[in-house]
Design a protein with these regions (language model features):
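Mature, function-bearing regions of proteins
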Residues: 1-246
Length: 246
């Protein structure tokens, strides 16, 4: 599979504890974890992929992104030998990376999509991966487990719709409490070839995208605080990489 890029638009809508909306442009890589992009040396600082940025390391063998995905699945009783794993994620830019959401689509050896891993990262450095069934028209439900905001508890459950991307990317995640949506996020994008020209172009239209994305999310937290959103006193410590289930 040839790697590709998605020029993306992210939207966040909070309905409680205060009403707040923002959107941000950026881009994401779509890759085969067994065939990560190889760029010219002079371009590598703007697109470097590191296994350490995702999931947990394997207990034995080389520490690669594929090994981390296999380890995560095996730890949950899932064995997909020989199957393709594609991922939507951010690459390191000048050594920095921030992945609010990384998604892995895990296929069996016959090419059938069997599982989806959605890994959420917080600006404080915590992360938690959720194992989901394939999602199409119907979203998958999973309990929220990671503390991602000083104004938001870990109660409630997510509805996640993450169909396998094609020419268009369309991911939706909504947080529900008392059967009502408290928060809705979308990630939409249009597919582009991962050419040198497109990589360079995206550095101009979305420079330092991972750093800007992290700063933008922190700024939204400050905005919520100025709107008198109540702060959560103690952040629950997540069980890293534990699968969430209803």
């Amino acid at each position: 599979m040839l790697s590709s890029l998605y020029r993306t638009r992210i939207t966040h809508l909070s309905r409680t504890p205060v009403h707040h909306y923002f959107e941000q442009g950026g881009y994401s890589w779509y890759v085969d974890v067994d065939e990560l992009p190889r760029l010219p040396r002079w371009l590598e600082p703007f697109a470097r992929f590191e296994a350490v940025d995702h999931l947990s390391p394997p207990t034995a063998g080389p520490d690669t992104l594929r090994a981390r995905v296999d380890h995560y699945l095996a730890d949950r009783g899932v064995d997909l030998p020989g199957g393709t794993v594609t991922a939507l994620l951010q690459a390191r830019v000048l050594g920095y990376v921030f992945n609010p959401l990384s998604i892995f689509w895990c296929h069996d050896r016959h090419g059938t999509l069997r599982h989806v891993i959605a890994e959420v990262h917080s600006t404080s450095g915590d992360r938690h991966a959720y194992l989901l069934p394939p999602t199409g028209a119907q979203p998958a439900a999973v309990k929220k487990a990671l503390f991602v905001s000083p104004t938001d508890e870990t109660d409630g459950y997510y509805l996640v719709r993450a169909p396998l991307p094609d020419a268009e990317l369309a991911v939706t995640i909504s947080l529900h409490r008392e059967n009502k949506p408290a928060f809705v996020a979308t990630l939409d994008g249009t597919r582009r070839k991962a050419s040198i020209a497109n990589v360079l172009r995206l550095q101009l239209v979305a420079p330092l995208a991972p750093l800007v994305g992290a700063m933008w999310i922190r700024l939204q937290g400050v905005t919520l605080w100025t709107q008198r959103a109540p702060a959560v006193r103690e952040a629950p410590i997540p069980e890293r990489e534990k699968v969430g289930q209803l």
